[in-house]
From Swiss-Prot:
Pfam families: SIP1. It comes from the Eukaryota. The gene is BRR1. The keyword Nucleus applies. Keywords: mRNA processing, mRNA splicing, Nucleus, Spliceosome. It is found in: Nucleus. GO terms for cellular component: small nuclear ribonucleoprotein complex; spliceosomal complex. Belongs to the BRR1 family. This is Pre-mRNA-splicing factor BRR1. Its main location: nucleus. One of its GO terms (molecular function) is snRNA binding. Interacts with HTA1 and associates with the spliceosome.
Length: 341
């Protein structure tokens, strides 16, 4: 290109060409190469514009690092009736629970061993229970025969009649007697006094134990260790709380056990255990909000031992459910109030 010649700016790219492609002095191979570069640039630019337009069409919401907080703020503007009910009653419910907990931990029976007189009465009760069974297997007949050889104290029958013993106790003792070789009264006494030393392992064993036994304060000193308590809380959170809320076959017994588990949960716990409790609280809250509580439906009842301790349910508490009590206790006593806010 001659020194005096100039090039008009490119209509698309807005730049002046470095030299005229029509100039005869330019190598034809260079011209072809530059044309291919131009076509590639045009194609790339067109794709970029198209993608940008598509992205604009798809974009409905621009993400923010504060999205979670924004959603939380929106939720707070629409509080469910079940959450309002919790907020209004939580302090009253937890205050009542704390008084019940103090009563159980202070006054409930805690087994420390049998006196001779008490053991004789238990043997007599067991003998009468076995004799009243409509059908008896060979093992039961043998146990009765062994017990008949024992010399019971005078007036033992009268005292035995006044002794309040749950037949469930006799059933459990019989199960263990059937697994033991019984040749003398001492063998029977040993089964009674040593208690059930079998350590429960896994979901099925614990489930069978809970549905077949009334919860008692002493159980948390004999059978349920501090470590096993947290295993039970996990089982409650994962499965049993659903059974309770939907009023399944064993919901009454499981409800009673949940009440006792809450009573025996330590007041000070580690961050790990707080997280386990929080999971249970969240599960309860989720169930409550899915199926709002109606008046007189699923209202809490007192386990047998609590009733015997003269624990009362005041009017302000009588329509509360165990799921509501659970989330309330976790929220207030374990610093998880955000669950109900």
């Amino acid at each position: 290109m001659k020194r005096g010649e100039s090039q008009a700016p490119d209509a698309i790219f807005g730049q002046s060409r470095a030299f005229a492609l029509s100039d005869s002095s330019v190598n034809p191979d260079v011209i072809e190469y530059l044309k291919s570069v131009r076509q590639e640039a045009l194609r790339t630019n067109a794709i970029s514009i198209k993608n940008h337009m598509n992205l604009q069409k798809r974009t409905r919401h621009k993400s923010s690092m504060y999205d979670d907080e924004d959603e939380g703020a929106l939720k707070r503007h629409a509080i469910s009736p079940s959450l309002i009910r919790l907020q209004r009653n939580v302090e009253i419910w937890v205050r009542w629970f704390n008084s019940v907990k103090a009563t159980v931990l202070t006054n409930a029976y805690e087994f420390t061993g049998y006196e001779d007189e008490t053991l004789d009465l238990l043997l007599l009760f067991l003998k009468n229970y076995l004799e009243d069974m409509p059908s008896k297997c060979t093992t039961v007949e043998k146990i009765i025969s062994v017990l008949n050889q024992h010399s019971f104290p005078e007036k033992a029958e009268e005292k035995e009649e006044n002794l309040q013993i749950d037949e469930e106790w006799a059933k459990n003792i019989l199960v263990r007697l059937e697994k033991t070789k019984i040749d003398s009264v001492e063998d029977v006494k040993k089964v009674i006094t040593e208690g059930d030393k079998h350590e429960l392992v896994g979901y099925n064993q614990w489930f069978q134990y809970l549905i077949n036994n009334e919860p008692q304060h002493t159980t948390f000193h004999e059978k349920i260790t501090s470590k096993q308590l947290w295993v039970l809380i996990k089982y409650m959170s994962n499965t049993w709380i659903k059974e309770i809320h939907k009023k399944g076959r064993h919901y009454r017994r499981l409800q009673d056990w949940l009440f006792y588990i809450l009573v025996h949960t330590p007041e000070r716990v580690t961050a790990e255990y707080t997280s386990i409790l929080r999971d249970l609280g969240k599960k309860c809250l989720e169930l409550i909000q899915k199926k709002p509580v109606e008046a007189h439906e699923n209202k809490i009842t007192l386990p047998k031992e609590m009733a015997e301790l003269n624990v009362e349910i005041p009017a302000a508490v009588e329509n509360m459910t165990i799921t509501e009590l659970t989330v309330s206790v976790i929220a207030v006593n374990y610093g998880q109030k955000d669950l109900i806010e």
